[in-house]
Amino acid sequence: IACWLHDVGKVVVPESILLKPGPLDATETQIMQEHPVIGEQICAPLKSLRPILPLIRHHHEKMDGSGYPDGLRGDAIPLNARILQVADIYDALTTDRPYRVALPHNEALSILFAEAENGWLDSAVVSKFALVSKGHDYFPVRGRTMLASYYA
């Protein structure tokens, strides 16, 4: 369930930021970086979702403490949040974005390993992800879904 809901806080982020074809400015970055906390707040009232609140909140933390929203480092980041983070980054890399086309599986894996080497991702999680995805270079490169289809 956390995989489906981890970015629910983005419902308050303007589409102009989500679909911006270039780098975000400081204000836009701040707005974007609020989505984990907002997602946690959206899900908190639902008792059945309380076990996944730490995953929603911490899926953008980095092993070296440079992530957000709380600057957690290393094992202070829940393991399931570290796993979700790797899956989320892989998904982002292999999906078309307004600023670039989707990357193939092997290129995405190379980036994940580089981010682990830089101290941002859990290297053990990246290694396990690479192991379970080995031989699966048939993973489709996916296009993006128009956000408008998610708005009521």
Residue ranges and their predicted role:
Residues 1-152:
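Metal-dependent catalytic cores of enzymes that make or break cyclic nucleotides
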